[in-house]
Amino acid sequence: MIYLETSALVKLIRIEVESDALADWLDDRTELRWITSALTEVELSRAIRAVSPEGLPAVPSVLARLDRFEIDAVIRSTAAAYPNPALRSLDAIHLATAQTAGSVAPLTALVTYDNRLKEAAEALSLAVVAPGQAR
């Protein structure tokens, strides 16, 4: 499984510096299931509306490629318990969703371009990638 956080999904709709590298990275892993949080249904539309409203018609097709995990009690309690005060609430939900999904089936990577989320995920020993991002 590949967990795609909203900052990555935006790059599949709006052309950004990392868009081609991300698309190539995903194309090399077509056998893996794409997953995300149900939160992404709202977050992706809001992000695209803010930065590239002409991309809104592409949101449903991107979401259709993803299996979405509901924000259930386990995910909520996991997200609430993270000790890092710099981890924002929505990022904590993404992290808890990825961590919970990874406890059920192998998680190849969490794809994010958000540095705070990246650091929090790496602290939990999750594999994090940001194809095309300069280190």
From Swiss-Prot:
It comes from Mycobacterium tuberculosis (strain ATCC 25618 / H37Rv). This is Ribonuclease VapC35. Its EC number is 3.1.-.-. The keyword Magnesium applies. Toxic component of a type II toxin-antitoxin (TA) system. An RNase. Upon expression in M.smegmatis inhibits colony formation. Its toxic effect is neutralized by coexpression with cognate antitoxin VapB35. Keywords: Hydrolase, Magnesium, Metal-binding, Nuclease, Toxin-antitoxin system. Its cofactor is Mg(2+). SUPFAM superfamilies: PIN domain-like. The gene is vapC35. Belongs to the PINc/VapC protein family. It comes from the Bacteria. Mg(2+) binds at residues 5, 91. Residues 2-123 form the PINc domain. The keyword Nuclease applies. One of its GO terms (biological process) is negative regulation of growth. Pfam families: PIN. One of its GO terms (molecular function) is RNA nuclease activity.
